From Swiss-Prot:
GO biological process, one term: translation
Pfam families recorded: Ribosomal_L22
Organism of derivation: Platanus occidentalis
Keywords: Chloroplast, Plastid, Ribonucleoprotein, Ribosomal protein, RNA-binding, rRNA-binding
Alphabetized InterPro entries for the sequence: Ribosomal_uL22, Ribosomal_uL22_bac/chlpt-type, Ribosomal_uL22_bac/org-type, Ribosomal_uL22_CS, Ribosomal_uL22_sf
Role description: This protein binds specifically to 23S rRNA. The globular domain of the protein is located near the polypeptide exit tunnel on the outside of the subunit, while an extended beta-hairpin is found that lines the wall of the exit tunnel in the center of the 70S ribosome.
Taxonomic superkingdom: Eukaryota
The gene coding this protein: rpl22
Quaternary structure, from the entry: Part of the 50S ribosomal subunit.
CDD domains: Ribosomal_L22
Family according to the record: Belongs to the universal ribosomal protein uL22 family.
Gene Ontology terms for molecular function: rRNA binding; structural constituent of ribosome
Protein name, entry field: Large ribosomal subunit protein uL22c
Length: 154
């Protein structure tokens, strides 16, 4: 299970969807296809896959990217799906009325989906290497400036 306290909160954001009304097995089939891919590639894959589980996962990925850009100031082009997991939720139990006063149980499975996005431009080893050779300056606030051989790149 993904811990609530993350190892690197400066480069990771997450979105959590609870009590989504579908089987965890069916959601895992889609999650396994997007784990480790970039944000833009994930959106294209989810739009083209013909499964019902794609829509809630699409909304969660989109929400996690909105959290990254609004709360942390990350660029969406630099985000990758670092962790994605599906856990089983509580089963909703209902009764379906049948003939002659009988009833059949209906079990509606639910699941909890967690999507964690990571900003690869701020990876620690990459940042240390860039700072060591003077390629990046980090301001106290969210603006970051990089420079290359020919000038300053924002």
């Amino acid at each position: 299970m993904i811990n609530k306290i993350k190892k690197n909160p400066d480069t990771e954001v997450y979105a959590l969807g609870q009590h989504i009304c579908m089987s965890a097995h069916k959601a895992r089939r889609v999650i396994d296809q997007i784990r480790g891919r970039s944000y833009e590639e994930t959106l294209m894959i989810l739009e083209l896959m013909p499964y019902r589980a794609c829509y809630p996962i699409f909304k969660l990925v989109y929400s996690a990217a909105a959290n990254a850009s609004h709360n942390m100031g990350f660029n969406e082009a630099d985000l990758i799906i670092s962790k994605a997991e599906v856990n089983e939720g509580p089963t909703m139990k209902r009764l379906k009325p049948r003939a002659r006063g009988r009833s059949y149980p209906i079990k509606r499975p639910t699941c909890h989906i967690t999507i964690v996005l990571k900003d690869i431009s701020l990876d620690e080893e990459y940042l240390i290497w860039l700072r060591k050779y003077g390629w990046i300056y980090r301001n106290k606030y969210t603006d970051r400036m990089c420079r290359d051989k020919y000038g300053i790149v924002g």
